[in-house]
Amino acid sequence: MKVVEVKHPLVRHKIGLMREGDISTKRFRELAAEVGSLLTYEATADFETETVTIEGWNGPVDVDQIKGKKVTVVPILRAGLGMMDGVLEHIPSARISVVGIYRDEETLEPVPYFEKLASDMNERIALIVDPMLATGGSMIATIDLLKKRGCTSIKALVLVAAPEGIKALEAAHPDVELYTAAIDRCLNEKGYILPGLGDAGDKIFGTK
């Protein structure tokens, strides 16, 4: 599985700011979108382009345009919504496919409760966004769902990943690409990433 830890200075700086324990909801939300934007830049670097001729201000001009499959952004509810706007800054015409999954706090297993996907998933590149890749359960369940709907080109964008989650994702879906702003140390006994960001969903929405 292709794993890319984006080590650009801006990404490292912004993730560092997000680790502050007393960060405000407003600031955390802004940074989540900003890092999501930077991860999108990296994740789309291999998109193919084609040369087309358009009418410029002084006559015809050849320009590059992205070709191939269209894109759908897949936020995993609820925390994934915090990264979605950052992706749409670069791909404003992308379709949005929503997947609702929460993690059972006792078993740490993913529990799906909602889905609304683009009708032509087999013709699209899916960019899944979720702030945390902890155990990997929610991400794996989401990818399972997308593949059942015919999607064959999938990239996952996360702010922070745990080694345990990366290992689980690779075992389940080695064909998927993972882009993360940081690979952290480990999970604690409750399945939270250390040092991590805390509960990203609570911090993005300001509610528990």
UniProtKB/Swiss-Prot annotation:
The pathway noted for it is: Pyrimidine metabolism; UMP biosynthesis via salvage pathway; UMP from uracil: step 1/1
E.C. designation(s): 2.4.2.9
Q: Give the cofactor note text.
A: Binds 1 Mg(2+) ion per subunit. The magnesium is bound as Mg-PRPP.
- SUPFAM superfamilies referenced in this protein's UniProt entry, alphabetically: PRTase-like (SSF53271)
Q: Per its Swiss-Prot or TrEMBL record, what regulates the activity?
A: Allosterically activated by GTP.
Q: Which InterPro entries match?
A: PRibTrfase_dom (IPR000836), PRTase-like (IPR029057), Upp_B (IPR034332), UPRTase/APRTase (IPR050054), Ura_phspho_trans (IPR005765)
Task: Give start-end of the signal peptide.
Answer: none
Q: Which residues bind uracil?
A: I193, G198, D199, A200
Q: Which reaction does it catalyse?
A: UMP + diphosphate = 5-phospho-alpha-D-ribose 1-diphosphate + uracil
Q: Which cofactor does it need?
A: Mg(2+)
Q: Which residues are recorded as binding 5-phospho-alpha-D-ribose 1-diphosphate?
A: R78, R103, D130, P131, M132, L133, A134, T135, G136, G137, S138, D199
Q: Name one GO molecular function term.
A: uracil phosphoribosyltransferase activity
This protein's UniProt keywords: Allosteric enzyme, Glycosyltransferase, GTP-binding, Magnesium, Nucleotide-binding, Transferase
Disulfide bond residue pairs: none
Q: Name one Pfam family in it.
A: UPRTase
> Which Gene Ontology biological process is one annotated for this entry?
UMP salvage
Q: What NCBIfam families does this protein map onto?
A: PRK00129.1, upp
Give the protein's function.
Answer: Catalyzes the conversion of uracil and 5-phospho-alpha-D-ribose 1-diphosphate (PRPP) to UMP and diphosphate.
The record's family statement is:
Belongs to the UPRTase family.
Protein name per the record: Uracil phosphoribosyltransferase
Lineage in the entry? Bacteria, Pseudomonadati, Pseudomonadota, Gammaproteobacteria, Alteromonadales
